[in-house]
Amino acid sequence: MPLSGDVKQKIMSDYATVDRDTGSPEVQVAMLTRRISDLTEHLKVHKHDHHSRRGLLLLVGRRRRLLNYLAKTDINRYRALIERLGLRR
């Protein structure tokens, strides 16, 4: 389930570090978090959709790798991001 352009623009404007920022770890993690929450809601209704469940696990793994990278490079940005997104670590 791809995100609509409006949702992407809102996430980018909220989490961007500079203008027109699409590739910073904060923006990427925020987008992945939104997709993960959408897929989680989908799987609550469609419990036997195993293809989407695998996609969810891949997204969670990608987000975990990005968060690990951010924690290694700048721990303060990492802590601010997980606090802002409400993630637990």
UniProtKB/Swiss-Prot annotation:
Keywords for this protein: Ribonucleoprotein, Ribosomal protein, RNA-binding, rRNA-binding
GO MF annotations, alphabetized: rRNA binding; structural constituent of ribosome
GO biological process terms on file: translation
Keyword Ribosomal protein: yes
PROSITE patterns: RIBOSOMAL_S15 (PS00362)
InterPro entries cross-referenced by the UniProt entry: Ribosomal_uS15 (IPR000589), Ribosomal_uS15_bac-type (IPR005290), uS15_NS1_RNA-bd_sf (IPR009068)
UniProt KW Membrane keyword: no
Superkingdom assignment: Bacteria
One Gene Ontology cellular component annotation held by this UniProt entry: cytosolic small ribosomal subunit
Matches recorded under SMART domains: Ribosomal_S15
Role description: One of the primary rRNA binding proteins, it binds directly to 16S rRNA where it helps nucleate assembly of the platform of the 30S subunit by binding and bridging several RNA helices of the 16S rRNA.
Protein family membership: Belongs to the universal ribosomal protein uS15 family.
Subunit structure: Part of the 30S ribosomal subunit. Forms a bridge to the 50S subunit in the 70S ribosome, contacting the 23S rRNA.
Protein name: Small ribosomal subunit protein uS15
Naturally occurring in which organism (per UniProt): Parafrankia sp. (strain EAN1pec)
Encoding gene per record: rpsO
